[in-house]
Amino acid sequence: MKGVAITGMGIISSIGNSVEENYISLIENKIGISRITNISTVHADVIKVGEIKKTNEELVKELNLTEDNNFSRTAMIGTLAAKQAVENAGITSINEFRTGLISATSVGGMDMTERHYYDYFTHPELVKYITCHDGGTADTANDAGL
């Protein structure tokens, strides 16, 4: 291998839903820390976070996922950013190139754990939600065709 080429960028954060929006927000010193509004959690009124201002339902729709998918919120956000990076690179067919994925994200799936933990032991169909606690890299790579 002779080197690595970074050909595209994508980002979804609490201050923007694209590279351009994030850049503008940084220049304008926008603050992305606020109360939790889009995740159902016992911590909603207790802590402030850098929350992505999209609901899980909006993310599912934007990614054209089925209702019964097991993408964690983290995986959906990472997948959206990866789609932006591929588009930013001008790539129309991912398999034309030797492609790798470097993903920098948080742990995923905690939202699924909070939602399904107590029912997990008596409802085997919920296993798919509890086992998705990686950062979503595999889901993102599969969605991109890697």
Spell out what each predicted region is.
Residues 1-146:
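Conserved "HGTGT" condensation-loop signature of ketosynthase/thiolase-family condensing enzymes
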